[in-house]
A protein has these predicted regions:
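N-terminal "domain-start" segment that seeds a small globular fold
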Residues: 17-35
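A structural micro-motif
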Residues: 19-21, 39, 73
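Thioredoxin-like thiol-disulfide oxidoreductase module
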Residues: 26-31, 63-133
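Short active-site neighborhood of thiol/selenol oxidoreductases, capturing the structured segment around
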Residues: 36-53, 75
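Short, flexible loop segments at the rims of nucleotide/cofactor-binding pockets, characterized by
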Residues: 19-20, 54, 98-103
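Detector for the c-type heme attachment site
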Residues: 53-57, 126
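Bacterial Sec-dependent N-terminal signal peptides
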Residues: 1-22
Length: 133
């Protein structure tokens, strides 16, 4: 009886683990594209954005959606107000006005500005040659 319960728990946990999008950084996606070309999907979000959280839970948290994304794209989760560096098309994009004490009220990241994104959430796509679509 205990072994059956453990098996059910293990299978349920395995399903939960596989039902998540395997997010990476934009630089990691560009590196992966060099050896195995795939399109890139970028979830551009902010920490204060309610619809961003709903997108995570209801869409990216869906087992079928996450499996499709993991199999067909390099998925990137990008904080539009974060402080990560992005190397793209010979440019280094940063957020020079980032202030950790202003969590949820930071300036837009240069990469977000470069892409022309002004609202969140935004899902951006790049083809397998890293061209912004």
């Amino acid at each position: 009886m205990v072994s059956r319960s453990l098996l059910i728990l293990f299978v349920g946990f395995s399903f939960f683990v596989t039902a998540q999008v395997k997010w990476m950084s934009f630089d990691e996606a560009l590196t992966a594209q060099k050896t195995s070309p795939r399109n890139i999907i970028v979830d551009v979000y902010t920490t204060w954005c309610g619809p961003c959280k709903m997108l995570d839970k209801n869409t990216f948290g869906n087992a079928e959606v996450s499996a499709f994304i993991n199999e067909n794209f390099y998925p990137v989760k990008f904080n539009a107000e974060g402080n990560s560096k992005v190397n793209f098309n010979g440019n280094v994009f940063e957020n020079p006005k980032y202030d950790p004490s202003r969590q949820g009220r930071n300036a837009r990241h240069q990469f977000t500005v470069y892409l022309g994104i002004t609202g969140y959430p935004t899902v951006a796509f790049f083809d397998e040659n890293a061209n912004y679509l």
